[in-house]
Amino acid sequence: MSLTKQYFKYVSQNIFGLLGTSCYILADTYFISQASGTSGVALLNLCLPIYNFIFAIGSMLGLGAATRYAILRAQGDERSERYFSNALLWALVFALPFMLAGIFCPEVLLRFMGGDAEIVTLGVGYARIFLLFTPFFMCNYIVSAFVRNDGDPSLAMVATLCGSLFNVVFDYIFMFPMGLGLPGAALATAVSPVLSIAICSRHFFKKSSTVRLVRQLPSPKLLAQSCQLGVSGFVGEMSSGLTTTVFNLLLLRLAGNVAVAAYGVVANYALVATAIFNGVAQGAQPLVSRCYGKNDAAGARKLLLLGSGTALALAAALYAVLFGFTGPIVAVFNSENSALMAQYAFSGMRIYFLGYFFAGFNIVAAGYLGAVDRPAEASATSLSRGIVAIVACSLVLSALFGMNGVWAAFPASEAITACLTIFLLKRKN
């Protein structure tokens, strides 16, 4: 199979898988909006940064260890076998603080994220349940990344889609027929990665599998080597959480809970968009790492060009759909028919999503830099879009233009980051 055909196979399957992951958060938002209105949407938006932090750690461990595994395996280095077990062990270590917070102080965490008394009371049960399942969220990321890098992207996609379908169906069953409310939504979301891991585990019993569990203690050295290549994934995931936190605080100050609920609508659709571009980056990563391990620089560059072109085409298609159907798209999560929330979300969607013309390229380029063992450049791109540029732009533009400035901060920061990314790519290429 040609490199181009392999690329489209891996990327398409990974996009579908990650779309499934983001769709279960959309399902949460929809059912919660039906059950609890704008307060429920505001609660979920305050919880999204916590989800992002959990997924960011899983991404750093999973993508970093799997990338290191793919490079060493292409070079015939037997040390590749140790990275899978090490990543799983460290996931359990990193998950422990989240589990303890879920048991002892979920209300403190919700207050820290900006929740008022109403939101905290509403969300304690929801937060407690999903925090207790943190190990499964992290391990799901790791298992899926290794299955994909071991030549089985189809199984990784099926596992993710099945987990997401379970979440959507049981969101409804737990919340409404069974009457569990918000804790029911959290339970459906929490069990979803357990099912995905179980399906992915089939791969390890195949004769073609080269991924093995190795009896070992957690190795800080292997962790550092993995995180070196996974830090861009960490920052990429964290960027959504940080953006959400900063925007929530700014919008609370500018217009209160209704503005936060409006951003909840924007942020949930943004998760879907980000999943599409992460699908391109993560789908190409095993092939790029394989080319790099075999010293095939031309093949790696070809994959970068394919990824960049795909990202631009997808951004154009995405914005065309969003621009044409902004009203109905916003209305899906506006169960109370709040005219003010609809107004805020309408303008927010059209301004915010311009950023994906740049963000798609930045995500693909950061993934490429990590896959070819250039962690410093990958981290610079991710840090710019995830922390430095987005915080600076949101503070400056919100002071100048109010709410429209908050929405414009995302495209402005991504445009700045794209300039930096092009410079970093040209510096060595």
Task: Please state what every model-predicted region is.
Residues 26-30, 100, 142-146, 168-173, ...:
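Alpha-helical transmembrane segments of multipass membrane proteins
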